[in-house]
Amino acid sequence: MAEKTYPMTQVEKDQLEKELEELKLVRRPEVVERIKIARSYGDLSENSEYDAAKDEQAFVEGQIQILETKIRYAEIIDSDAVAKDEVAIGKTVLVQEVGTNDKDTYHIVGAAGADIFSGKISNESPIAHALIGKKTGDLATIESPAGSYQVEIISVEKTN
């Protein structure tokens, strides 16, 4: 069975590699040290510090595995390889809802780089699905829980 790929820009992959390095070189040794200290307190059956450190160790190791998988199966998307005005991963899109003056800006990123609070939406999101492949001036229908609506793509730029 083929492994799932994780579309992302090179910048996103670099960020994941930096985060992985932080987990392996800083967080993992810190947790090991906390476990060592907690063990020195004696009886592990009622040692909350030990339990908390082991829980944190499991979390850190899980995060390391997730990041290693995403990096190993990263599919680097070169936004320069698509038309300048075409929506793709690594592009910033300004849209206007048809019939209104409401405008929104979205930065399309791979799922690993999504952060709705900074306007970075996953390529797997309904909004990105509706926009990817469209060009400046095109209309796109976005499906939302409140119903569907149309937007016009006002501009498309490469995200820095």
Curated annotation (Swiss-Prot):
UniProtKB keywords: Coiled coil, DNA-binding, Transcription, Transcription regulation
GO terms under biological process: DNA-templated transcription elongation; regulation of DNA-templated transcription elongation
Matching SUPFAM superfamilies: FKBP-like, GreA transcript cleavage protein, N-terminal domain
Keyword flag RNA-binding: no
Coiled coil residues, start to end: 1-72
GO molecular function: DNA binding; RNA polymerase binding
Taxonomic superkingdom: Bacteria
Oxidoreductase in keyword set: no
One Pfam family in the UniProt entry: GreA_GreB
PANTHER family membership: TRANSCRIPTION ELONGATION FACTOR GREA
Functional note: Necessary for efficient RNA polymerase transcription elongation past template-encoded arresting sites. The arresting sites in DNA have the property of trapping a certain fraction of elongating RNA polymerases that pass through, resulting in locked ternary complexes. Cleavage of the nascent transcript by cleavage factors such as GreA or GreB allows the resumption of elongation from the new 3'terminus. GreA releases sequences of 2 to 3 nucleotides.
Family the UniProt entry places it in: Belongs to the GreA/GreB family.
Record's protein name: Transcription elongation factor GreA
Species per Swiss-Prot/TrEMBL record: Streptococcus agalactiae serotype V (strain ATCC BAA-611 / 2603 V/R)
Name of the gene this protein is made from: greA
